[in-house]
């Protein structure tokens, strides 16, 4: 019975990673095979309003591997998979107001650094 729980957990983890990857490609960018480098790109939605808003987009380092048994024993909540990654984030930005009341961050520099969305 315990074997089936572990097997189900691995399947669910794999499925969630696949879904995360699938949803991280907006508007048909899934068809591109290579991943562009981390750099400034113009936001196409705000470009329609005539306002040049730039965002950091691109790929950085990411990998996942099985957690070593020795490390798993010391965890408060043992996890079977360990991941390491860096994300394309803004090194510098300027706060701008668009359409009178919408406040945005217009990125001016990008680099690969800690993934802030992973931190809770």
Swiss-Prot record:
Compartments, record wording: Secreted
Subunit record text: Heterodimer. The active hormones thyrotropin, lutropin and follitropin are heterodimers composed of CGA, a common alpha chain described here and a unique beta chain which confers their biological specificity to the hormones: TSHB for thyrotropin, LHB for lutropin and FSHB for follitropin.
Glycosylation sites: 80, 106
Protein name: Glycoprotein hormones alpha chain
InterPro entries found in the cross-reference section: Cystine-knot_cytokine, Glyco_hormone
Gene Ontology biological process terms from the UniProt entry: G protein-coupled receptor signaling pathway; positive regulation of steroid biosynthetic process; regulation of signaling receptor activity; thyroid hormone generation
DNA repair recorded as keyword: no
Protein family: Belongs to the glycoprotein hormones subunit alpha family.
Entry keyword set: Disulfide bond, Glycoprotein, Hormone, Secreted, Signal
Disulfide-bonded cysteines: 35-59, 38-88, 56-110, 60-112, 87-115
GO molecular function: follicle-stimulating hormone activity
Record-level GO cellular component terms: extracellular space; follicle-stimulating hormone complex
Any Pfam family: Hormone_6
Gene name, Swiss-Prot/TrEMBL: CGA
Signal sequence residues: 1-24
Transmembrane regions: none
């Amino acid at each position: 019975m315990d074997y089936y729980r572990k097997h189900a957990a691995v399947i669910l983890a794999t499925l969630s990673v696949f879904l995360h990857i699938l949803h991280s490609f907006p508007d048909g960018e899934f068809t591109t095979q290579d991943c562009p480098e981390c750099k400034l790109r113009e936001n196409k939605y705000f470009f329609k309003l005539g306002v040049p808003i730039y965002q950091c987009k691109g790929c950085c380092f990411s990998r996942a591997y099985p957690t070593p048994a020795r490390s798993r024993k010391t965890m408060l909540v043992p996890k079977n998979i360990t991941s390491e990654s860096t994300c394309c984030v803004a090194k510098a930005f300027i706060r701008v107001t668009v359409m009178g009341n919408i406040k945005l961050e217009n990125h001016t520099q990008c680099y690969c650094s800690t993934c802030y969305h992973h931190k809770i």
